[in-house]
Regions:
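SIR2/sirtuin-family catalytic core signature
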Residues: 1-17, 23, 27-28, 35-38, ...
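Surface-exposed cleft-lining segments at the edges of enzyme active sites
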Residues: 133-143, 279-285
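Extended, H/D-rich, highly charged conserved domains that either
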Residues: 42-128, 138-272
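C-terminal or late-domain output modules
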Residues: 7, 89, 109, 113, ...
Length: 368
């Protein structure tokens, strides 16, 4: 069996420099300055917010926010963050990784003690601004027009196509199922789906918000996070919730004592009230379940050869952990951009049968 895991490098190869991190951030700022953004979905203040966060970048590098880290994954993320930047120099707003802005966001909000719903709403606006910049007014969905016949043929030679990209260029060019590990611009998030399990509950989780279908990509399943553990959590939470709910309902229906306990739960607590309502609703409508929108299990199931192209060995560690744990992957072919990436890949996959290849040679061959 042959599988391939594809990252943003493939979009950059065919779509150009506009999909580099710096240009995505610049486009986000330019969209706001030109008033060519959906202001009702993310306000113009988002641009000021980016610059305010960027001003704290140096402070975060030099330990100022160390005491405002309250979770293990945030601490790990901050350590990694410090390793990726030079603490002796200043970085412009476009030199900071756009996902790192979300770490800075959390650190500052921790320091200021800002909580939900203000924190949630601000994070959501920041996410929409960056996703809109990646989407590039839909231009990203046309990148496949630059794919060569040879590249498409190579893609089709694989049994499984997996990607961390949000766009549908691989889907369109091959006509095959593509597994979007971090979500897709074209898939509505369960949060905004009126037919989803969570939106059948009495409480209005969306607080009356209506989806603007002129901008479906801003309501999509795309994962944007500064830490792989949070992406991994988002990828697995639906399956875990379904498993837990099945156990609750089974106990509720088969154990009279547990049924009495659940029926007597104090509904003055919103979380308890929602859980109780969900159990009763699931018991009455067993077909209801949380949609599993991320194919997170696939990396544990594939076998044979896995080729990796367009990804850095220093990002998406949560995915590489699944690959390392999968004993049925007998060979990894890592396409690198330069000697440093090759060395990093060899260190990362030292326990695997690994071969490396310069991605520039790959493109010369496949496009010939």
């Amino acid at each position: 069996m042959r599988s391939v895991l594809i990252g943003n490098g493939v979009v950059i190869q065919h779509g150009g420099a506009g999909y580099f991190n710096a240009n995505i951030i610049q486009r986000a700022l330019d969209n706001i300055r030109a008033e060519s953004h959906p202001a009702h979905l993310y306000p113009e203040e988002c641009a000021d917010f980016v610059f305010a966060l960027a001003k704290e970048h140096s402070a975060a590098l030099n330990g100022y926010y160390d005491n405002y880290v309250f979770t293990t994954y945030d601490r790990v993320s901050l350590t990694d963050f410090k390793l990726r930047y030079d603490s002796t120099r200043k970085y412009s707003a476009t030199e900071i990784g756009f996902e790192d802005y979300f770490l800075l966001f959390e650190l500052i909000h921790n320091k200021l003690g800002v909580t939900n719903p203000e924190r949630f709403n601000s994070r959501c606006a920041l996410r929409r601004m960056f996703l809109d910049a990646v989407f590039n007014k839909g231009k990203i969905e046309s990148v496949h027009k630059q794919f060569s016949v040879g590249f498409v043929k190579w893609l089709k030679s694989h049994n499984n196509i997996l990607t961390t990209n949000y766009d549908s260029n691989l889907d369109i060019s091959t006509g095959l199922p593509v597994h979007h590990l971090h979500g897709s611009f074209n898939t509505l998030s369960e949060v905004y789906d009126p037919n989803s399990f969570r939106n059948q509950l009495e409480d209005d989780f969306l607080n009356g918000e209506k989806v603007d279908f002129d901008y479906p990509h801003l309501y999509s399943t795309c994962l944007v996070s500064y830490v792989g553990d949070l992406k991994s959590h988002s990828m697995t939470q639906s399956s875990l919730a379904n498993s837990g709910m099945e156990k609750f309902v089974e106990g509720y229906q088969s154990n009279p004592d547990l049924r009495k306990q659940i029926d007597a739960w104090d509904e003055s607590n919103d979380l308890v009230k929602r859980l109780k309502e969900a159990i009763l609703l699931k018991a009455e409508h067993p077909e209801l379940e949380h949609s599993e929108q991320y194919p997170h299990k696939l990396l544990r199931k594939i076998s044979g050869t896995l080729e990796i192209i367009g990804l850095s060995p220093n990002n998406d560690g949560h995915l590489f952990e699944h690959i390392l744990d999968n004993r049925n992957i007998t060979q990894i072919v890592f396409h690198h951009f330069g000697a440093q990436e090759a060395a990093d890949a060899e260190r990362l996959f030292s326990s695997k049968n690994l071969s490396t290849r310069d991605v520039r040679d790959f493109w010369l061959d496949v496009n010939a």
